[in-house]
């Protein structure tokens, strides 16, 4: 098993998926952008599905929670925990300059690669674990619109 496979806990038989997921556009035309597109869609779906099934929160609150878990900032933190930055294939201009945006993009691309390699169920479990979705109740709720609506409804009935 390759080092990256061990870090991710995924054995890639088709090396092309993970190699592209770790390759920045500045390095090659065979890069992470298409996998990022796929991973972004899968993340939105699986995080939304998980929150819908595990919570009875309102649509607005669920939207805020999902936005937190798929945000560039949060995905960048999750990328750091994977400890795979040394595996990135970057153009010379980016050596030592891996931004939060790149980390988030690569995390999404890794999700796309895992999905293509292992399917939806494996990907779902990977996302639940790596995004720590089980602790969604501990995420601050900044859904001010819902809070205002509830306040108005409670006071002006």
Regions of interest found by a model, annotated:
Residues 1-157:
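Double-stranded RNA-binding/processing signature
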């Amino acid at each position: 098993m390759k080092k990256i496979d061990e870090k991710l806990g995924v054995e890639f038989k088709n090396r092309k998926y993970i190699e592209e997921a770790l390759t920045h556009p500045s390095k090659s035309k065979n890069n992470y952008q298409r996998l990022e597109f796929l991973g972004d869609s899968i993340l939105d779906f699986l995080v939304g599905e998980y929150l819908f099934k595990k919570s009875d929160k309102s649509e607005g609150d669920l939207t805020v929670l999902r936005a937190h878990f798929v945000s560039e900032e949060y995905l960048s933190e999750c990328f750091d925990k994977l400890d795979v930055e040394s595996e990135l294939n970057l153009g010379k201009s980016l050596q030592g300059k891996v931004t939060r945006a790149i980390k988030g993009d690569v995390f999404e691309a890794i999700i796309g690669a895992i999905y293509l390699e292992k399917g939806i169920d494996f990907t779902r479990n990977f996302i639940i674990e790596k995004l720590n979705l089980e602790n969604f109740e501990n995420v601050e709720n900044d859904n001010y619109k819902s809070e205002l609506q509830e306040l108005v409804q409670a006071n002006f009935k």
